[in-house]
Structures are given as C-alpha cells and as structure tokens.
C-alpha cells in the first residue's frame, strides 16, 4: 500500500498506519512460472472457492494510484493478479500462487482475519481448491502420476491445524 494512501492513528502512545479504503483477498501468479497454465488454473479455482464462501477480492491493485504496487488483473472472475517479480512464484517448477487472504491495513479486516472462524473459512477454500486442482490434473501436488490406468481415483486434501493456522496441504491418492 503506498504511503500516500495510509492514514495514522495513535493507540497507547504508538503510531499506527491504516487504510480502510480497500478490503478483500488477492491471488498472485507469475507469467514466468514454469507451469503458468497450472498456476492460473489453481488461482482461478482458489478465487472461486473464496467467493463461494462470501469473500470478495480487492480491486485496488489495478488502480493507477497504487504506483509501483499496481498489478495487472489477469482473471477478473477470481481476483487473480500478475506478479512476475516475486521469486517464489516465478522460480518454481510447479504451479504456484500467493494468496493475500485480506488487507491487514484495513482495521476491520485485520480483526476479522485474526478470528478462528475467518481462518477456517480461508483454510476450507484452500483445501477445496487443492482437491479440485489435483482431481482435474490427475496427479499429486508433487507432480507424480496419480495411479495406474484404469483404476478409479479419488483425491482428498489433508489439512492439519496448529494454533488455528492451516499447515501445508497435501494432495493424496486414495484407492
């Protein structure tokens, strides 16, 4: 968030910055990723799952006033933006997305993001997106073949929670 869009308030003698103008999630992908198509497909699925749970994406990354923080919206249906400079997105050999689950400079959204309920909503959306992605690609997240031809395949995303935070999701083949 550019400094010119932030406002200040003092709380217990400490200066804080905020901007209540924008709220919502954002999903980022890189055109330089080795599996750009897979990244876009997963980003689309993730955005759709978040929207099914009544979350909305933030459009502010497309505004000129964002300056160097401005990003091209590549999937307006799902809230997926292009972010080529981010190493973790562009240098991986597998599909990759970055999920910004909300805007913590928005005071109300920061409070919502801190609740176990909101974390669970986001974790459930990520889980469903991983399940859909694995099922549609016929492979595990690691890129291995899913099973022997002719066998019925079922996929399940496993999710573990520790202190209310979702840990990495693993796509597992179930026979």
Name these PLM-found stretches.
Residues 1-162:
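Active-site-proximal helix/loop segments of hydrolytic enzymes
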Residues 157, 161, 166-175:
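Long, low-complexity, intrinsically disordered segments
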């Amino acid at each position: 968030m550019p400094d010119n869009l932030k406002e200040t308030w003092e709380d217990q003698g400490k200066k804080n910055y905020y901007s209540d103008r924008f709220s919502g999630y954002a999903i980022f992908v890189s055109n330089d990723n080795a599996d750009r198509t897979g990244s876009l497909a997963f980003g689309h699925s993730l955005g759709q799952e978040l929207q099914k749970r009544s979350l909305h994406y933030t459009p502010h990354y497309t505004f000129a006033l964002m300056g160097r923080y401005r990003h091209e919206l590549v999937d307006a249906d799902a809230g997926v933006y292009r972010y080529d400079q981010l190493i973790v997105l562009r240098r991986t050999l597998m599909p990759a997305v970055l999920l910004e689950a909300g805007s913590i400079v928005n005071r109300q959204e920061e409070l919502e993001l801190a609740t176990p309920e909101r974390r669970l909503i986001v974790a459930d959306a990520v889980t469903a997106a991983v399940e859909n992605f694995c099922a549609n690609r016929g492979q595990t997240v690691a890129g291995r073949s899913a099973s022997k031809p002719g066998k019925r395949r079922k996929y399940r995303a496993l999710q573990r929670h520790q202190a209310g935070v979702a840990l990495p999701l693993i796509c597992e083949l179930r026979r």
